[in-house]
Amino acid sequence: MAALTGSPSTLQILPKKTLLVPSTRSRCLFMTSLLRPSSISALTSMQKKSSSKVVALLLSENDSHRGDVLHAASSMLSNCLSETHLDQTVRGLLSKSRGKVRDVYDAGDHLVLVTTDRQSAFDRVLASIPFKGQVLNETSLWWFNKTQHITPNALVSAPDRNVTIAKKCSVFPVEFVVRRYITGSTDTSLWTVYAEGIRNYCGNSLPEGLVKNEKLSANILTPTTKSADHDVPVSPDEILQLGLMTKDELDEVSNKALALFSYGQQVALENGLILVDTKYEFGKAADGTIMLVDEVHTPDSSRYWIANSYQERFNSGIEPENVDKEFLRLWFKEHCNPYEDEVLPEAPKDLVCELAWRYIFLFETITNSKFQLPVSEVAYYKLYFTPVGSGHINFLLSQEPIHDRITRNVSNALSSF
């Protein structure tokens, strides 16, 4: 490490003067600098310029942008948000439930949903992907805002880049999957069941002669029951027979799901992408309003393909260019049995970083905005102490741990309710 010295206009890097042992929690470095008080503003200015260089990455198709993201992802591999414990750090949270990707906390009338970097498929966690939680959360926020003309949603606020605070509601135990293409590699994917000879799936009659990745004649609904272990395909008639929803609820949610998907297809195609399939979850608020919950049109809940190369690759029998987690699924299927093997191989680091890039590429492409990469260097500084009469200032230079940042932001948000 090094210390900063010089006048406000001529800051220089000097060898470190003092290094104290940091706590593992904050990973802080105490350094003595020769800065005078008047130099603080210069340090602040320098940090802002450095930060903007790192995070202001605009959407670009050139290799330089992809390289920047891959480098940033590689540097964050050991700092992913794989687990949270806000029930231990935020006052007022009543309990925690751990999903495959999200940690959900009960806050009375609201739920605090923390989107982690955990990557799930085949009903289990496969890896942790840098920036993934932030990408999913911010992608959903964008779509929640854009789809309010179709359906209300449970969003209340987003106090942190990984956090959504939502209205508490009774979630229907059904996931509404909408598809336009026959594809996939999981047990419940349309291509898997079709290849096994099934021609009536979730109440949909499928014609003979379809091939993988082919476009269907219309959008179709293929619901599944929600389960902690394994989702089970179910038809609309079975949903009613099992008492999972009333007919009115089923009709309303089905119409909303199809309308959301149609709108998502339109937005995706306008930006050079194909929304292949996706899943939605809905709940009922205390006043009876049916609302969209969880996430919407993220690369975790959806498949996206590059539009301009789809037809040529399909005609050649080549897998479409995808902008989702399908290529990671395929890697695991080629190297193990992800459903039955007790221990899975570790995903290659270059594959993990590539997935981080694809998720960010999707966010930037859909939203036409830049993705703010978290600063992986010194995030902020604090005045530690000033020895009287010494003319020196000691600074605490620190990268704020992700969990501390989330704790701070969630605590502030809940205190305002």
Where are these regions (language model features)?
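N-terminal chloroplast transit peptides
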Residues: 1-45
